[in-house]
């Protein structure tokens, strides 16, 4: 995450990022991911990303500070988060949607839900 954000920040004045933290995995990494996003991104969209059987409230508590800045939006539904980010994105600012890549399913409460970040973005272009 650090490498890609740093690379984009070298080329662009502003960068927006959308990401989430997986459930039942790497709890200590969650807050580091958010802090990394804060270093490079002027706008952060925090959303779901394979919460598995872990409650999203627990994931948010691990990842986000209690005094959340205005530059961070929390939108639990990943599809809605992508829509909000794309529709509010100013021209000439890149939006980095991180974490899912080519995956076509989300694991939410141990239910497999069809979802593709790529398809979600393509709806707007």
Task: Show the residue positions of the predicted features.
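ATP-dependent carboxylate-amine ligase
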Residues: 1-125
């Amino acid at each position: 995450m650090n490498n890609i954000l740093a690379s984009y920040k070298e080329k662009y004045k502003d960068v927006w990022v959308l990401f989430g933290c997986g459930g039942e995995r790497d709890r200590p990494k969650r807050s580091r991911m958010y802090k990394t996003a804060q270093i490079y991104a002027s706008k952060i969209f925090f959303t779901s990303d394979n919460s598995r059987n872990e409650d999203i409230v627990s994931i948010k508590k691990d990842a986000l500070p209690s005094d959340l800045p205005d530059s961070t939006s929390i939108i639990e539904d990943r599809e809605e988060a992508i829509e909000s980010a794309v529709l509010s994105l100013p021209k000439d600012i890149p939006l980095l949607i991180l974490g899912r890549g080519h995956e076509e399913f989300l694991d939410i409460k141990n239910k497999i839900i069809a979802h593709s970040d790529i398809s979600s973005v393509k709806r707007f272009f």
